[in-house]
């Protein structure tokens, strides 16, 4: 199983609440999730959040959301927490929450390369 995990911290230092900033009429992170879900080689996309405020803001969207600790120092730490909670995965892709225009073909290409026997 190939899983994309999107770490989404609400209170980033440089731009607090960036993930909830409206873009195309919805929170930025929603655009990121929707684009990630278009990747054909991902079996699952998980949004890893750290606050009830984010959870409430996204309640109308049908996404796979996992609440994580607020005490992580990095998105990688947040992803590691999620990985411990989920089923086994062949490939984990770290997709940044502030990449609302990510091209799903890039995700697919990365997975193809990682699945290649020559890797």
Spans of features found by a protein language model:
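N-terminal glycine-rich phosphate-binding loop and ensuing alpha1 helix
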Residues: 1-49
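Conserved acidic residues
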Residues: 2, 43, 90, 118-119
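Conserved N-terminal catalytic core of the sugar/cofactor nucleotidyltransferase
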Residues: 30-90
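Acidic metal-phosphate-binding loop of nucleotide-sugar-dependent transferases
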Residues: 72, 99-101
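Short aromatic/hydrophobic "clamp" motif used to bind/position activated sugar donors
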Residues: 92-94
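Conserved donor-nucleotide/metal-binding helix-loop-beta segment in metal-dependent transferases, i.e.
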Residues: 103-119
